[in-house]
């Protein structure tokens, strides 16, 4: 092996065979890949599809389709697509029913005020938040695999949808609208929000058909947390006009956060003292209650419903004091009874809305899947990402027919459900029962609810998202790169908007992956005396090296982005180019350890083939060790065996090194052994 003598160079290859062998060692011949296949056999080759369908193939295909349509086949499909058919027979009624009922009612009680609050964030009337807290929850309970997941309105999605609604159906510049004109404007906005839900649901169903559940891995944890934290700041700023009683047009597009702040500061003198007082008192109650629920979650039988208490107090105060007429406090007003008629959303704006539906569908899937995975790991069960795509796709698609806006799982209500003792998706049905009761019998009560209270509920629900910034010091300690991704994504979300911030975060995150693979260092290996282990020589000065033998390990995928780096590193170590490793002896035998190369693309395979030819031209005997089956198959298709013989492909570095040492011996019998 080429390298400095300080690393324990062995002057004579004969000395290597005289090293102290490991205790209880046995000896065998070095195994090439071909010899290993001959002794132990290989995997069964997958049958290739014929170029033209033959009669036996058509018969097999017909039998397969007939089996899928048979009774057992249909039952298997139902079991796969309707999770309740799997978990209901195993449901522990005595142990779980009470917990599911209490948790479902608790979450449902919170859904009512939060749904109305997030509806205002979506720029639609409050009652549509109640619809979005009912239909999607019901559908997910039937199709979802997350036993502890709570779905419904989500502040980040409401903010993103509200921006689309404001762009597609802007507020008229005149400002003063008649009652009929206001109803028409609200109807158009409801239709736009439902169209966004329809588009995002259709996209998720398309991803389900294509089995693209793996896409959730492209939204890394730093990107998701930075996105939600930055969106929480957008929510806070967007609610300032409602907190202060200001009637300001909603800002959309890039720099909307700063535009809103500037508009609020310029109109600060026009604030309503009554609504400022209501907002201050609401926050004084809501924020401490949230903190108490977190700090004493182990001592409380069920979390304190601060939102419900605040809604009751504010509504009674506004009704008894006539705040809406005496001080012009904005209230929710009348809510329509029952449910809306199923109606296909207007698709005229769908081409414009579809581009906005894509990031919404990605955020929906990524947040829901990550939350479901966290609790699945905690409670030892598994979720199915592709089934989650189906559940959220159907949930958004069908609920859009009932004028619902986009929905997903939420961190606040999911943690609330778990803390309250929820065990299965059955808790969602109890939550739906509470929302249904509010829609059927409690509508008149919400007439006098101040909108400022709903704004305070929006802000207080962002508490956990703001506190995600506390994890930054730990993230910096673990990985500087992930810390940089978090900061860049957060700045992009805050400065631009949520959609562009998400795109920036994904691009930066993917670029860091590419950059990490391009900065990989090739490791030169040496033998640990008395063992069969080959370790990087930079880890110890006592590792043995043999003159003329170079063992290299490249611990990264070999593809188009790393091809140049691989080429330069191998040239430098083997002395094939103009830049030669200083103090290195000429290499006679080289071993490439492929155990760290997980995959090779066409460009990488051609680079390996070119390397073997250059080694032949320079008189270097090249051996490849420990290629996985996929890498070896790709190299074979690139005509690697035209440049090397099967006798140069070994199953391990130890086997290749034993063969190389025999080749370096000037005389002696050509018999070599490997310690095992």
Swiss-Prot record:
One Gene Ontology CC term in the entry: membrane
Main localization, broad class: membrane
InterPro entries in the cross-refs: SLC26A/SulP_dom (IPR011547), SLC26A/SulP_fam (IPR001902), STAS_dom (IPR002645), STAS_dom_sf (IPR036513)
CDD domains membership: STAS_SulP_like_sulfate_transporter
Bilayer topology annotation: Multi-pass membrane protein
Keyword match S-adenosyl-L-methionine: no
Segments forming domain STAS: 539-660
Annotated TM spans: 101-121, 124-144, 149-165, 190-210, 226-246, 267-287, 300-320, 353-373, 398-418, 426-446, 487-507
Region (Disordered): 1-24
SUPFAM superfamilies found in the cross-reference section: SpoIIaa-like (SSF52091)
UniProt cross-references to PROSITE patterns, sorted A to Z: STAS
Places the protein is found: Membrane
The keyword Transmembrane helix appears for this protein: yes
GO molecular function: antiporter activity
Assigned keywords, A-Z: Antiport, Chloride, Membrane, Transmembrane, Transmembrane helix, Transport
UniProt family annotation: Belongs to the SLC26A/SulP transporter (TC 2.A.53) family.
Known function: Chloride/bicarbonate exchanger.
UniProt-recorded name of the protein: Solute carrier family 26 member 10
Name of the gene: Slc26a10
